[in-house]
C-alpha cells in the first residue's frame, strides 16, 4: 500500500479500479496524493480525490474505472437441498473437513453455536471487518481482522456473562451473511444442518458503499450495497489467507449487480474467474432473482433512419435509475429519447469520450448520456444513461445502428433492490437476466430453488451469458 488507512476509508476520497500495467503502477506510486492497493496481477484499486480537470462520469474516467455497486440477493429456505442425506454418506467424506469456506457478505454472528464444533470452540478461523478501525496485520490495509483465538476468547466471555464485543467487536446487523453461513456450514442443531457442517469459516464483512457512489447510481437510502473495489479486495484476502494456511478454499458471495456486460469482462468477474485457476479454489455466486422483474430488454437496432423502440415505464418517481445499453460485437449504436409528455431529444451522435446532459422542462427531469465506443474490458460499446428524477409515465428510447447491418443489443436497468423509483421495461426479456458477476466463465452460478414446489423458482435469473456460454462454461 502507498498511503494510509484514512485515505481508503475517507468518504471524500474517490475509489477507482485501474488496470495493473507497469507504467500506470509506477506513475500512481510516485503520486503522493494517491493510495494504491494491488488486487492481483491485472488489477489495482486506487484512492484519491477527483482531479480538477476531470468530471465524475464514465466518459472522463472510463466505464470500468468507476466501481459498480452490489446489493444483497434474496434468500429463502433451502431445507429441501437434503443436506442431511448428503452429509450422512460416510463414503463421500463431504462434511467440509479441512476446507475453508470464505464468505463475502454483511458479516457473521460469531456467537451462534451453529458455527462451533462439538467441543464448543469456534470454527470461524478469521473475520475481516472492513468497517472497523485499522489494526496492523499480515493481510489487509484497512479494517480489522479477528483471528480464531480472539473469537474463542469472546465466546468464553459471552458464556460467562461478560460482553463479548469487548473482545471481538464485529456484528452482522442485517443477518444476511449469518444466514448464508448457516446454509453452507452450520453444524447439526435440532433438525437443521448446513451442507458442510465441519468446514472452517473465514468471513469478510464489507463496508458500506461511499455516498458519492450511491448518489451517482441513485441508490435508495435504505438499500444495503457495497463497492466493487471492496469485494475485489475481499476475494484477494480470502485467497491469501487460505494460501498461508495451505487449505482448499470455496468462496461464496451472495451479492449481485444489475449493471455490466454479462460477458465475464467486469473487473470483479475477472478477479473471481482468475482465482478459480488456482489449485483447490472455487467460487460460487448467485444467478440473481431478476427473471420476472422486467429489468432486461433485448432487440435488433435497425439501420438509420429506422430504429428499435424501447419503452420504460416509471410508475413512481424517485431519485432516478441507471440504464445500460450494450451493443454486440463491433456494432455501434446511438439513441434518441422521447419523454412522457412527448418532448423529443433527437438522435444523439455517438461521440467518443463525451458526457451529455439533457433537461426536460415539463417533467423536471434530467438524463445524462455517455458513450463508450469500445469498452476496454468487454470489448463492446456501452451507452450509459442516468435518469435523474424521471417523471412518471412512459419513456421511449429509440436505438439506432450506425453500421450496415441490424445491430443486436441488450439493455439492463438498476436492480429493483437498489432502485429509488419504480421503473421497468414494458416489453422485457426474461433471458440473460443473470446479475454480475454470474457471467464469469469458471464461476459456479447458483439459481433459486422453490422448496414449496420442488422446482426452479420463477424469479430465478436465467442465462445464457452474452457470449452464449453457461456458467460455469465447458470451455
Regions found by a protein language model. Give the residues of each.
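Short acidic, glycine-rich surface-loop motifs adjacent to enzyme active sites
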Residues: 235-262, 286
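Noncatalytic modules at the cell exterior or secretory-pathway interfaces
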Residues: 389-401
